Amino acid sequence: MNTYAQESKLRLKTKIGADGRCVIEDNFFTPPFKLMAPFYPKDDLAEIMLLAVSPGLMKGDAQDMQLNIGPNCKLRITSQSFEKIHNTEDGFASRDMHIVVGENAFLDFAPFPLIPFENAHFKGNTTISLRSSSQLLYSEIIVAGRVARNELFKFNRLHTKISILQDEKPIYYDNTILDPKTTNMNNMCMFDGYTHYLNLVLVNCPIELSGARELIEESEGVDGAVSKIASSHLCLKALAKGSEPLLHLREKIARLVTQTTTQKV
């Protein structure tokens, strides 16, 4: 049962406006969602912040998000704050997100980290459809719990799936299952003493494998690696003992990518 009596929905569709920049063509949302009007921090790159007017996700909360980024749009989507998953008791909270990125469009999806509280159970499913000319920078950061309270890996279960298709052909699939009841989260194959995890995917972005590795090596307090996936796209995964090192690493990569992507001809 949803806290808001119905599934929480968000719809966003963008297009190129009269001035040649990305604008909102259509949008719709139900509580707790809201959207800020786009602003333009750099050239023709628009930035839209997704707002959730709530303390976080509770038992039974279900979110349905659909984002359609129009052809030639250049857009960065952010969130307002860290996302909290509260104690879901004997239930769970969920999110289904479908993203379409049109021809010659660029999307930088950069939400703040996800924090599962004690006994939290969360299910997330993201499907992203691209064209061959689409560019994507997509990330998620997962925290071990309320670190300042030493509440580490006390959540029930966290399961997120990311599926990326290019011209209807799958090019990337990630299935992250964190279940402290059945897995030692601190073993060397999992968090290995770290508390924050970054998963970043780059499709058709102007950054080389060697360049991404250099940025990881330059990042103090970060242990990570990057590899090529289908069609020479990149997947980067990193661990740290705080959110700031991972957010800084992600921002450095995004800055490098957008410097090229948003250059006016």
UniProtKB/Swiss-Prot annotation:
GO MF term list: nickel cation binding
One Pfam family matching this protein: UreD
Disulfide bridge map: none
Main location: cytoplasm
Transmembrane segments: none
Keywords from the UniProt entry: Chaperone, Cytoplasm, Nickel insertion
Alphabetical list of InterPro entries matching this protein: UreD
Compartment(s) of residence: Cytoplasm
Gene Ontology CC terms, in alphabetical order: cytoplasm
Oligomeric form and interacting partners: UreH, UreF and UreG form a complex that acts as a GTP-hydrolysis-dependent molecular chaperone, activating the urease apoprotein by helping to assemble the nickel containing metallocenter of UreC. The UreE protein probably delivers the nickel.
Family that this chain belongs to: Belongs to the UreD family.
Known function: Required for maturation of urease via the functional incorporation of the urease nickel metallocenter.
HAMAP family attached to this UniProt entry: UreD
Protein name: Urease accessory protein UreH
Originating organism: Helicobacter pylori (strain J99 / ATCC 700824)
Gene giving rise to this polypeptide: ureH
